[in-house]
Amino acid sequence: MDVKASPLYFLSKGMTNILGIVTMVCLISFLVSCGQVAQQKKEKAMNEDLLSVSFPTEKEGWACGRWGTVLHTADGGKTWLLQPTGTENTLVSIHFVDPQNGWAVGEEGTILHTADGKTWEKQKSPVPYYLMKVKFVTPLKGYIVGERTHILSTVDGGKTWNIQFKDEDFILKSVSFCDDLHGWAVGEYGYIYHTKDGGVTWKKQAGYFDISKETEAIEGGNFLFDVTVVDPQTAWAVGIDGYVIRTVDGGKIWKEVKTDAPKTQFFCAASNQGGTVLIGGNGAFLISTDSGKTWKNPKFEPPIIYGWIYGIARRSSTEFVAVGWDGGIYLSDGKNPLSAWHRVKM
């Protein structure tokens, strides 16, 4: 079994150093159920775990996941169709800048690009590592983060990708920008990097890693799985054990935000400029409409208590979509994200 094919591998790779053997035992059954046999051929299905979603317009959207799965909707998420991708590698992240131009990244340095929203072609990666998140700020300028604290960049729509930044030998899980200059990248051990010049320079703002001289135990910051940027001053990051942090001063100070949620794993986050923040994870989904002062659990039909939410995207200024375990696609009902959410019937 190749556990690297499991969606949890991409989200929690490296967590054993701080979670320990007990946590890994709890995750074994999930890894086994999600594992794939190396080189095995498999027909793509509509119920593959989905790890990421992107809506460049209110109607047009794409989601990606295991076995090279890419789904497309042209009606705001009501119906979805599979798109051929030419790969069986797990696709961890997808992002579209408009209904034609999109990118998906994942296992073994996989980078896919479409210029018509229909057909996908491979782009050459300068590294063979796992690529965790892709974000484009224009149809030509984009970023990818992944293993070994690598940040890749392109200024020609992915015709050429270059290593823009690398630091410690950790995994960056996510990258997000609010414009073509201001962005953050986050990852293992609470590492946070910030740019205010479009990636020309990346500066570390938080994170630490050490090994105790007395016990030889690994010590480090809380793992961060996702970051969402509101404006040049404001950003949110989420991670292990229900950890949520926010900055309102461009990252000079990151403060923990209490949500009263159980210590579950928060894998994804999304936000808008109206003060709405959404957080999803292991059987958990939280929404704040007042910039984090209060948090509520929206009603899901069916309930997601036993499910996993891996990706959230905004599909309009007030409407959102979430994806996750077993091909789950959830849409917020109406203009208020606190209203009931429903799962799309595939």
Model-based region annotation:
Residues 1-15:
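N-terminal secretory signal peptides that target proteins for export/translocation
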Residues 14-17, 25, 77, 336:
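N-terminal processing/targeting junctions
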Residues 20-30:
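Bacterial N-terminal signal peptides
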Residues 34-346:
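Residue-level hotspots at or immediately adjacent to binding/recognition sites across diverse folds
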